[in-house]
Amino acid sequence: MVEIVVVKLIYRIMENNMNDTELAGVNENLPRRQIVLDKLNEWGIPFTMYEHPPLPTIEMALEYWKDVEATHCKNLFFRNHKGNKHYLVVFECHQQMAIHDIEKMLHQGKLSFASEQRMDKYLGLKPGSVSPFGLINDTNKEVKLFLDKNLKDAPLLSFHPNDNRASLVVKNEDFMRYLELWGGEWEFLELY
């Protein structure tokens, strides 16, 4: 409870220096973040949360992550050619993956990045805040998660809590427990 209050107080302080568009983004994302925090607390999954300015890209985030000990992840949301299947692909943030290489690895046919509308529909997220925590919103378990197998060996993992103004660090074993409790389809794959 204290952590939640602190988050709200920090945002009230930040609001004094923001324009209306920035304020709308903060107010819109706080409930998304709160859903994640509530679910992790409900499931007994410990985490450390780091707050920072909005970081919609990896390049911007690296400056703020430099002192955060964790494997920071890149999260890409795809759809198949027909648009009837959706995939979240997660790998270490410093790796580069071409979409054609990902298509070959996943064996799911031709892929394209999912639209903002699909991202909202299936993950309840906006661009720049995609993470496996968005799977909490996939109540019908329609998104398949692919994790690079190298993440198996990372002691700590870092993801946005459905809000790119913060990063959550969780122990690998706690993240695996999160995936089990989520209950959707996921697998490790050698992506690079």
Q: Over which residues does each language-model region extend?
A:
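Acidic, Ala/Val/Gly-enriched low-complexity intrinsically disordered segments
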Residues: 2-7
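Extended, low-hydrophobicity, polar/charged segments
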Residues: 9-192
